[in-house]
């Protein structure tokens, strides 16, 4: 089976604000590691690390983590795209 990418495009704020992590190098590292989430354990570990290092994450950071977890689960289910348009969410299968 060919390898494929899964993309997620939802109408939610999902980012790390400067008020949460101001150091750009740390922020870039965290973005890369969040993008690498593949399992529930990865998600739990990342959330725990964020809490320990930077305090309580806001809604945008929690959304970012949830989207990374959703993307990993969707990929395992051979979903290539999750796209929200208005109130409709479309799932495209491989």
Listing of model-derived features with the role each one plays in the protein:
Residues 1-94:
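Accessory helical-bundle/CTD segments and flexible terminal tails appended to RecA-like ATPase motors
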């Amino acid at each position: 089976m060919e390898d494929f990418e899964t993309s997620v495009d939802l109408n939610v704020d999902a980012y790390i604000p400067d008020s949460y992590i101001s150091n750009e190098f740390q922020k870039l590292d965290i973005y890369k590691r969040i993008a690498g989430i593949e399992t529930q354990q990865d998600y739990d570990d990342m959330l725990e690390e964020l809490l320990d290092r930077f305090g309580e994450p806001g809604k945008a950071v929690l959304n970012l983590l949830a989207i990374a977890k959703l993307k990993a689960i969707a990929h395992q289910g051979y979903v290539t795209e999750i796209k929200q348009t208005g109130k409709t969410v479309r799932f495209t299968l491989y």
